[in-house]
Structure formats: C-alpha cells, structure tokens
C-alpha cells in the first residue's frame, strides 16, 4: 500500500513545485527605489511611469504638488508611488524630499535628475536673473539632489544609479541660448566628475542627451515653446515635426524614448557603464562625440 506521505508527495508537492517553477521572473527593477525630479510632466513623468512598470517603487517629485500627486496616483497605490513636492532650488526641500523617500520605501538607490526649465534669449538680452535661475534649477539643483541621495546610497552600501537628463545643447553650440546651454553643459560634466568619485561605492553615474522632446513637455508649454517656434519660423504645434525633420532619422523624439534609454542604463544590462551618456535625438550630427 502507498503511505500517506507518498500520496501527499504525488498529489500535492510535485504539483506545487511545478507551480513555483512556472512563476514569472521578478521584474528588472524589483526592490529598487527611484527618486525622479521634474516628474509631473513630460520626460520626468514618462520615466517615473516606466520605472514603476519595471518593478521599482517611485518617488514622484516636482514643485507642482497637485500634478505630482496626479502622476503618482496614476501609477498606483502608495505601495508603489508616492508624490513628494520639491523645489530643487531649495537645499532644505531637497533634504526633506530625500528623507521622505527613505521613510516611504526604506531607502533610495536610483536617482533621476530631470527637473529643468529654459529661457531662450540672446547674450545681450540675458539678465543675471535669467542666468541664475537656470543654473539654480539644473546645475545647482541636480548637484544637490545627487549629493543628498549619495549620502543615503553610501550609508546603504548597496550601490546605485544616478542619471542626469541633460540635453543635446550640452555639446552643441546654438545661438541665443547661452544660459540654458551652459547649465546643461554643467550637468553633463557633473556626470563625469561624479562617476570618477563614486565608482568606489558601486554608484554609477550616467546621462541622457535628448533633443526636441516637445510632446507633454512642461518647458515647451511656456515661453520657450513660443520662442523656439518664432526662432525657427514654424507654427508652435509643428515644432515636434520641425525637430524631427532636421535629424538623420527624421523621427520625432517622445518622452517614452527617453524613458527607454534610462531603463537601458539601469535595467541590469549595462552594469559596466558609468561616466557616459546616451543621445536620444534621432541623430544630430553636430552632437556626435569628437
């Protein structure tokens, strides 16, 4: 006769083992905690949504608290996404936001510096206030976010990723754009400097250089969009097509394409890459490395 134990093994345990073997693999970013600035619209929103879809818990950070909350709720419950208002020009607000991220999810190990703005003016029309604001938001703001999140990552001793959303303008000179281009160039060099410093802690620092991301953009929704349309002599709602037309691939760059590049860097396939950047511009020859 068959023992009760053998009956159990035949009828139950083998079946359960088969079920376990058929379970889907964990998502690529499971157990990662991402802090995304400028996440209420455009590129930042697309990145936050993509990282969450790949398994990460996400802090949706933006100075527009209501919009950030809408994005977080759209992603999912507070077990997955939490909105944290933050103006990156404020050192104190950044410190508080990182602390809230740690409180919400137990740590931070994936940081996206996306917050930005632009005021396009000629050199003679660019005021000190114009210059200071763009550097405070992008150069200084990303420095502060990187510094405060690095404190956490070093203490965690688990490594991590910092990604800067810079711009094609970081490497291509264009007229009537001095403050924005200089701030983006600052961000691009922060990538290299921080990569050199943080490698010993297992923290990788990389950048993305997009170009012409009009759809859903908070930057293009303001005076920047009007100015660029006037500068290029096109209708505002045709800006995306215009930018696509001057690229090698003749394809418009959307926020989701930038999010794809971020995931490529942090999804586990490029673990030996740091201090570099990925252009997401459909091919802009003047931006080629040289």
Model-derived features with residue positions:
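Residue(s) in the substrate-gating loop at a strand-loop-helix junction
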Residues: 167
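Substrate-binding pocket helix/loop in short-chain dehydrogenase/reductase
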Residues: 122-123, 127-135, 243
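Active-site loop immediately N-terminal to the catalytic Tyr-X3-Lys motif
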Residues: 124, 172-178, 200, 250
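Alpha-helical segment proximal to the catalytic Tyr-Lys
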Residues: 151, 196-197, 271
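Short, small/polar-rich loop/turn modules that mediate ligand/substrate recognition or access, typified
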Residues: 199, 204, 273-275
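Short C-terminal tail/terminal secondary-structure segment
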Residues: 270, 274-290
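Active-site helix of classical SDR
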Residues: 146, 183
């Amino acid at each position: 006769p068959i023992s009760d134990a053998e009956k159990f093994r035949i009828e139950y345990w083998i079946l359960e083992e088969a079920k376990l073997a058929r379970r889907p693999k964990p998502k690529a970013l499971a157990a990662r905690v991402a802090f995304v600035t400028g996440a209420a619209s455009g590129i930042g929103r697309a990145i936050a949504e993509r990282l969450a879809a790949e398994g990460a818990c996400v802090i949706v950070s933006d100075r527009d608290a209501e919009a950030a909350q809408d994005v977080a709720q759209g992603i999912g419950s507070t077990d997955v996404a939490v909105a944290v208002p933050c103006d990156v020009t404020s050192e104190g607000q950044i410190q508080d936001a990182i602390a809230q991220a740690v409180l919400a999810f137990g740590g931070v190990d994936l940081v996206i510096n996306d917050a930005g703005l632009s005021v396009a003016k000629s050199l003679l029309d660019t005021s000190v206030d114009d210059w200071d604001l763009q550097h405070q938001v992008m150069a200084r703001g990303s420095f502060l976010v990187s510094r405060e999140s690095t404190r956490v990552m070093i203490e965690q001793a688990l490594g991590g990723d910092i990604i800067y959303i810079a711009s094609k303008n970081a490497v291509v000179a264009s007229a009537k754009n001095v403050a924005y281009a200089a701030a983006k160039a600052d961000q691009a060099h922060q990538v290299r400097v921080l990569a050199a410093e943080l490698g010993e802690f297992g923290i990788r620092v990389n950048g993305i250089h997009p170009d012409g991301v009009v759809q859903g953009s908070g930057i293009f929704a303001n005076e920047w969009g009007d100015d660029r349309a006037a500068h290029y002599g096109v209708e505002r709602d045709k800006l995306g097509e215009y930018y696509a037309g001057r690229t090698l691939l003749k394809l418009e760059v959307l926020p989701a394409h930038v999010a794809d590049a971020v995931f490529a860097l942090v999804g586990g396939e490029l673990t030996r890459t740091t201090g570099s950047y990925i252009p997401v511009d459909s091919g802009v020859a003047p931006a080629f490395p040289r």
